[in-house]
């Protein structure tokens, strides 16, 4: 009705079609000049009905006109009369009517509830019940897993969850046979089901031995995917007879190995899998299904629990080789070695889709830290294959329930999962949930969440909880987990709830602290026995289980497998050849200089920025200066030295991967390897990376601004470098002080990985280090800790002090076929210190210097008069040179030790011999006496001194904190240590 009455009313508000404008001149206001024009417009706005502010007034006039045409002024009446001859908006000739009576009519009807739907009370009741049924369905999807039959020990009753009962929604027994719409479920092709059938279907699907959490996922497509998988099958696996026999075979192998080791090697640690044998069936299914889907490599990370079982029954390690390790007859070729349950292993196995390479990562006892290492290894393999989505490489991480919930590195690793620089296309997580962490089994002490898996909800990973005593449900859960990962490229978690038959290790007595749990365990017949009895009841043979067990035991007695799963003659074209890097020495020569013509060509390429890129003025200045440096017009600074090292390497075929919290720009804005267009209109576009445009066939250059994590990111890069010796992999700390946030990675992998496991790794660490008054958290990369870890030529520790030195040491890391971790203590103030710049000759006609000798020509000329030699490392050198100049001394020589480990004995000895009459050698450092290099270099310096020379120390006093927080105190300390370097020796000295 209102629409009809508005037929011409719209015309009142329609703008007049433009045409010749006639200005009606108000009396007494001449229209002349700009001022007059403005006054006219003001008059026009206040009088014109076209002005929006007058619309309510015009509407009111029009209402009055429709009610009584004579009630409005003549000029308005004439206008409204003419308006009635204009066709309505819908083209009809209907006449407008007043709105006011119509509006009032609607108001009265609303008061009288005249619009209420006329429906029977019976219809309303049915509709309400349908809504309640939908609520019940939603409740099972959300909460069903909490009522699932998941605990093999059945230690507690199922919790009471009112929302899963029909009565919670007002539904009673009388409603059970009423049919309701089931259109939003996948239980049946029928559109309707009785409430009884719906309830049974919900309980079968969500509350059996498999409980799935997926409703926390925000993407509707993924939720529907899970609903369809679960509801269409009622979560019930369908296995053929042969598949069931194969599952029993895997359970038999898992239990058989543990029983064999338990009786043959009594009391020896092996961290038994007993109670969690379904895990081996899960791994077997995962590998076979992954191979069928085109996966060609699976990288596995896991802790000690069940590891020996995986080595033998999953990866195909020969039982006799494992027994040799127990018997201590296995070859011991490594300097240190490691226990058997930390060992890694690689093999190639047959699957329906072809050979699959399996790799179990070496790992320490520090739980979960191997996870980001595995992810890094996977990313390296993906990059090598050009596998952008993770179609060919699959990461599989195996966790314990207590560690998964308790170790913070898991949160950091999950945070990497969907980022551009670290994504691996989704990880399959399997949790051996034996419901106990060492001696802790009370959930009130284990964690602060309902499930150990709750941390993954932050990345919206689905979780499948499954009863380990139902191996067929475990197999089904594995299939769905893999399908989800391959479909959506996201993490997925399979939580296998089982138990730990023995103690934490075989020397432990768990009933001391878990008497109730271990009474239950003592009464449990074992998963293999339960499943064998189930198959026997299905008519698959009463003696099937016993026959399999005897056959497996017999094979172990002979040190072999019942079926050899390993392909011995398969060689993937993507396998890495480490032979060129074996047996190398750190003293091997490396030509790191580049020809001048090549220098200029590369410099021009990395400083030629497209005109379409609108650079920030400060960044433009940096690149203009770099262009001048490339031409030899300016001395080369640190940022240019880095860039030229990178450019020369990628142009020679060495990929570069650099990551850190501010690596693109550099913490101290010296790098600018990523140029941001200042006029870009999209946040995800408008960057330009000059080092990606060095040559047409160059190797990749990737710089990543990482998430705010040290531990997981450094471990990831270690894993990457350990799988790709041809790539220069760099991790840069924002400040070196924060590197100890990843101390576990440094201690357990970087420092000791080679002597424990024989794993070489060329990872480079850049740790900004230097005492410049920024306090205890922004001064020290803890040089002393790396010096303490240095042994067996396990790493290289370098503190370069010039642009040329950083250029050569970065190139040396790749050009020389030695893959050892390189720890660079990089500067802060030296990044812009002109004294730290270098000439072109330093790049084109020189190399890396482990020790930089005296450079002052006057001191060198008067070498015989030198009485004191000051040795140092790092930026303190420039403070010492400045002080010597102030004092006008020519009898003091200053040496820089650029490489602190491996210590350059021959070079230092040669430098000291240049000053035969020196009686004193002083080690000067910025760091406190108990920190820095002093305690680790004094014996090396002493070894190379001349007879009769005394060695002393000049530096800060021992301190519990790396640096002071008071600026004035820092200055006082710095002045004192520089003065001490030139003053009388005090305190402890060593005489040769």
Where are these regions (language model features)?
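Thiamine diphosphate
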Residues: 40-43, 50-51, 424-543, 547, ...
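Subset of Sec-pathway N-terminal targeting signals
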Residues: 42-83, 87
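Extended, charge-enriched "interface" segments that sit outside catalytic cores
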Residues: 83-279, 295
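Conserved phosphate/anionic-ligand binding catalytic regions in large, soluble enzymes, centered on
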Residues: 136-152, 285-314, 399-419, 489, ...
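Glycine/aspartate-rich loop-and-adjacent alpha/beta segment that forms the canonical ThDP
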Residues: 140-143, 147-180, 184-192, 196, ...
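Active-site cores of enzymes that catalyze phosphoryl transfer or operate on phosphate-rich substrates
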Residues: 235-257, 323-375, 379-386, 817-886
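Cofactor-binding active-site loop characterized by glycine-rich and histidine/acidic residues
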Residues: 296-460, 464, 668-724
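Hard-cation-handling environments
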Residues: 527-528, 534, 538, 542-656, ...
């Amino acid at each position: 009705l209102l629409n009809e009455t508005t037929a011409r009313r719209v015309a009142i508000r329609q703008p007049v079609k433009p045409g010749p404008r006639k200005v009606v001149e108000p009396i007494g206001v001449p229209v002349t000049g700009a001022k007059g024009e403005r006054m006219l417009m003001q008059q026009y706005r206040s009088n014109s009905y076209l002005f929006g502010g007058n619309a309510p007034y015009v509407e009111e006039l029009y209402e009055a006109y429709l009610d009584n045409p004579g009630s409005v002024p003549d000029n308005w009446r004439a206008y409204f009369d003419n308006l009635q001859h204009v066709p309505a908006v819908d083209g009809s000739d209907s006449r407008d009517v007043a709105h006011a009576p119509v509006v009032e009519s609607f108001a009265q009807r609303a008061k009288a509830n005249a619009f209420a739907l006329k429906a029977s009370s019976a219809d309303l009741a049915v509709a309400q019940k349908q809504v309640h049924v939908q609520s019940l369905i939603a409740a099972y999807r959300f909460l069903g897993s909490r009522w699932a039959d998941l605990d093999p020990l059945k230690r507690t009753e199922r919790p009471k969850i009112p929302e899963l009962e029909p009565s919670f929604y007002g539904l009673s027994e009388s409603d059970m046979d009423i049919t309701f719409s089931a259109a939003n479920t996948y239980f049946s092709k029928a559109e309707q089901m009785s409430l009884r059938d719906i309830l049974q279907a919900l309980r079968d699907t969500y509350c059996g031995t498999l409980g799935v959490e997926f409703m926390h996922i925000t993407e509707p497509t993924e939720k529907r995917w899970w609903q369809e998988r679960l509801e269409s099958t009622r979560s019930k696996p369908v296995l053929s007879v042969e598949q069931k026999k194969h599952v029993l075979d895997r359970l038999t192998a898992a239990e058989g190995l543990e029983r064999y080791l338990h009786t043959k090697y009594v009391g020896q640690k092996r961290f038994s899998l007993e109670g969690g044998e379904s895990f081996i069936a899960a791994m077997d299914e995962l590998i076979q299904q992954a191979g069928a889907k085109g996966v060609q490599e699976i990288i596995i990370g896991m802790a000690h629990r069940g590891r020996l079982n995986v080595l033998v029954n999953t990866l195909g390690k020969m039982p006799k080789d494992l027994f040799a390790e127990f018997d201590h007859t296995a070859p011991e070729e490594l300097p240190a070695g490691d226990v058997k349950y930390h060992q890694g292993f690689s093999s190639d196995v047959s699957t329906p889709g072809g050979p699959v390479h399996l790799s179990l990562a070496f790992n320490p006892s520090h739980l979960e830290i191997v996870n980001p290492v595995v992810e890094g290894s996977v990313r390296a393999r993906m990059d090598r294959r050009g596998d952008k989505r993770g179609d060919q490489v699959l990461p599989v991480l195996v966790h314990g329930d207590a560690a998964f919930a308790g170790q913070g590195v898991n949160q950091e690793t999950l945070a990497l999962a969907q980022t551009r620089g670290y994504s691996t296309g989704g990880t399959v997580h399997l949790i051996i949930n034996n419901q106990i962490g060492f001696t802790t089994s009370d959930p009130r002490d284990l964690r602060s969440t309902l499930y150990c898996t709750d941390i993954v909800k932050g990345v919206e990973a689905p979780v499948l909880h499954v009863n380990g005593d139902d191996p067929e449900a475990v197999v089904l859960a594995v299939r769905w987990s893999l399908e989800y990962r391959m479909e959506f490229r996201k993490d997925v978690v399979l939580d296998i709830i089982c138990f730990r038959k023995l103690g934490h290790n075989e020397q432990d007595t768990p009933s001391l602290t878990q008497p109730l749990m271990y009474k239950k365990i003592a009464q449990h017949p074992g998963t293999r026995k339960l499943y064998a009895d189930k198959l026997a009841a299905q008519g698959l043979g009463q003696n099937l289980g016993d026959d399999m067990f005897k056959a497996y035991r017999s094979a172990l007695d002979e040190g072999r497998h019942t079926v050899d799963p390993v392909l011995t003659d398969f060689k993937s074209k993507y396998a890495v050849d480490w032979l060129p890097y074996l047996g190398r020495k750190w003293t091997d020569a490396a030509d790191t200089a580049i020809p001048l013509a090549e220098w200029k060509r590369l410099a021009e390429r990395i400083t030629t920025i497209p005109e379409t890129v609108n650079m920030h003025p400060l960044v433009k200045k940096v690149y203009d200066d770099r262009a001048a440096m490339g031409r030899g017009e300016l001395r080369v600074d640190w940022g240019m030295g880095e860039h030229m090292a990178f450019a020369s390497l990628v142009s020679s075929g060495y990929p570069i991967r650099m990551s850190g919290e501010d690596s693109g720009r550099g913490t101290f804005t010296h790098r600018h390897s990523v140029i941001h267009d200042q006029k870009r209109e999209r946040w995800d576009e408008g960057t330009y990376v000059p080092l990606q445009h060095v040559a047409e066939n160059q190797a990749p250059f990737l710089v990543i601004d990482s998430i705010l994590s040290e531990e997981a990111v450094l471990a990831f890069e270690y894993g990457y470098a350990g799988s790709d010796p041809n790539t220069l992999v760099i991790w840069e700390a924002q400040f070196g002080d924060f590197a100890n946030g990843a101390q576990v990675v440094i201690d357990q992998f970087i420092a000791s990985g080679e002597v424990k496991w024989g794993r070489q790794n060329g990872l480079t660490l850049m740790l900004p280090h230097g005492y410049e008054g920024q306090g205890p958290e922004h001064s020290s990369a803890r040089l002393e800790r790396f010096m303490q870890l240095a042994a067996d030529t396990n790493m290289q520790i370098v503190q370069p002090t010039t642009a040329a030195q950083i250029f050569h040491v970065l190139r040396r890391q790749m050009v020389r076929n030695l893959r050892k971790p390189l720890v660079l203590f990089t500067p802060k103030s030296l990044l812009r210190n002109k004294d730290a710049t270098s000439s072109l000759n330093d790049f084109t006609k020189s190399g890396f210097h482990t020790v930089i000798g005296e450079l002052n020509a006057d001191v060198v000329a008067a070498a015989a008069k030198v009485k004191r030699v000051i040795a140092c490392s790092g930026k303190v050198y420039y403070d010492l040179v400045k002080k010597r100049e102030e004092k006008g001394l020519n009898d003091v020589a200053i040496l820089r030790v650029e490489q602190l480990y491996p210590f350059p004995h021959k070079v230092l000895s040669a430098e000291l011999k240049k000053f035969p009459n020196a009686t004193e050698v002083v080690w000067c450092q910025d760091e406190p006496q108990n920190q820095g290099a002093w305690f680790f270099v004094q014996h090396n310096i002493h070894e190379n001194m001349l007879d009769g020379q005394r060695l002393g120390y000049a530096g800060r006093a021992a301190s519990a904190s790396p640096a002071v927080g008071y600026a004035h105190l820092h200055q006082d300390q710095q002045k004192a240590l520089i003065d001490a370097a030139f003053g009388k020796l005090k305190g402890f000295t060593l005489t040769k």
